[in-house]
C-alpha cells in the first residue's frame, strides 16, 4: 500500500518537502471552439459546436481535477499552491466517464463494421481484428495525428515524468 501511495505521488504530483502540492502545468491549454471545428472540417464533418465543455472535458486527466487534488491534500496533509498566472484552473471532472461511453460506442461501430465487412469469418478472427483496432496505442497515435495531444490537460509531474504528450 505504501508503495502505491509513493508511486501515485511520484507520477501525478510535485509535493515539495515543505508540504506544498503543485499540480499546475503551464503546458496545459484548453481546446477552443475553432480548433474543434477545424479538426472536424478536416475530415468532412461540418458541425456547429454547441457544448464546447464536453469536448474540453474529454481532454482532462484525473490528475488535474479538483476532487483528486483535494483527496491528495487531505490524505497527505499538504496544501496546494495558488494557481500560477497563465495556468489552466483545476477542473471539476476528468474524461473517465466520457471514455467509458466512447469506448462502448467505438467498439460497437468497429464490431458492426467487421461483422458486415467479413461475413464469412469466424468469431475468433473478428475478435482478434477488433482487439487490434480498438487499441490504446492506435487511438493515442490517432489523437496525436489529428492534433489533440497538445490539448491534454494533466498535472505537471505526469507530463514531465511520462512525457504523456509524446505517447
PLM regions and their residue ranges:
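RNase III-family endoribonuclease catalytic core
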Residues: 1-167
Amino acid at each position: 500500500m505504501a508503495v502505491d501511495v509513493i508511486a501515485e505521488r511520484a507520477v501525478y504530483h510535485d509535493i515539495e518537502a515543505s508540504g506544498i502540492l503543485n499540480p499546475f502545468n503551464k503546458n496545459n491549454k484548453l481546446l477552443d471552439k475553432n480548433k474543434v471545428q477545424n479538426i472536424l472540417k478536416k475530415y468532412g464533418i461540418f458541425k456547429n459546436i454547441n457544448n464546447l465543455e464536453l469536448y474540453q472535458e474529454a481532454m482532462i486527466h484525473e490528475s488535474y481535477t479538483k476532487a483528486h487534488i483535494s483527496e491528495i491534500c487531505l490524505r497527505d496533509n499538504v496544501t496546494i499552491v495558488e494557481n500560477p498566472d497563465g495556468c489552466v484552473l483545476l477542473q471539476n471532472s476528468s474524461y473517465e466517464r466520457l471514455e467509458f461511453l466512447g469506448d462502448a460506442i467505438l467498439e460497437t461501430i468497429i464490431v458492426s463494421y467487421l461483422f458486415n465487412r467479413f461475413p464469412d469469418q469466424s468469431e475468433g478472427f473478428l475478435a482478434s481484428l477488433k482487439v487490434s483496432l480498438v487499441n490504446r496505442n492506435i487511438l493515442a497515435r490517432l489523437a496525436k495525428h489529428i492534433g489533440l495531444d497538445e490539448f491534454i490537460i494533466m498535472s505537471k509531474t505526469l507530463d514531465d515524468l511520462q512525457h504523456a504528450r509524446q505517447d
